[in-house]
Curated annotation (Swiss-Prot):
This is dCTP deaminase. Gene3D superfamilies: 2.70.40.10. Homotrimer. Catalyzes the deamination of dCTP to dUTP. Pfam families: DCD. Keywords: Hydrolase, Nucleotide metabolism, Nucleotide-binding. It is an enzyme of class 3 (hydrolase). The active site is at E139.
Length: 190
């Protein structure tokens, strides 16, 4: 497997709708206001995806237990805003602005941006498997003892694309993966 460069990512986004909407280049300043942004868009060997305005922040209002086999949404507070405050030592779910369609011979890895990591904000996203498509559900942990701010419509993580020299026998779409074509923030399901 080899990592794919900006030219390949651009061609796949524009000709195969692999990333929608696609931003051709790094954006780090709001052109209208001059405000600095956490960068997003096409980079040399990846694509920096953005957070949407949808967030789900963990709360313990009902004294619940997090159980991935029996997950209830009453452990979340849903927020729609340009920023989200993640409580100290807590966790939030969000989704990407971008919708991805991964080719059959490609696997991605997603790595959190250093700007957030240096603030104690850790991002986890599982690989996008061959022929998976959907909005990306993003797990965000605030490892600090302080509230942490995350920004909608700005970069949160970088997606790296790896192309195999051979095609897999069974893709995510073939096995009817449970998170196929997910819209919005998708909570755990078994």
């Amino acid at each position: 497997m080899s990592i794919k460069e900006d030219k390949w990512i651009r061609e796949m986004a524009l000709n195969a709708d692999m990333i929608h909407p696609f931003v051709n280049g790094q954006v780090n300043v709001n052109e209208e206001t001059g405000e600095k942004l956490i960068s997003y868009g096409l980079s040399s060997y990846g694509y920096d995806l953005r957070l949407s305005r949808e967030f789900k922040v963990f709360t313990n209002v009902y004294n619940s237990v997090v159980d991935p086999k029996c997950f209830t949404e009453d452990i979340f507070i849903s927020i729609t805003d340009d920023v989200c405050i993640v409580p100290p030592n807590s966790f939030a779910l969000a989704r990407s602005v971008e919708y991805f369609r991964i080719p059959r011979n490609v696997l991605t890895m997603c790595i959190g941006k250093s700007t957030y990591a240096r603030c104690g904000i850790i991002v986890n996203v599982t690989p996008f498997e061959p022929e998976w498509e959907g909005h990306v559900t993003i797990e965000i942990s605030n490892t600090t003892p302080l509230p942490a701010k995350i920004y909608a419509n700005e970069g949160i993580a970088q997606v790296l694309f790896f192309e195999s020299s051979t095609t897999c026998e069974v893709s995510y779409a073939d096995r009817k993966g449970k998170y196929q074509k997910q819209q919005g923030i998708t909570v755990p399901c078994v």
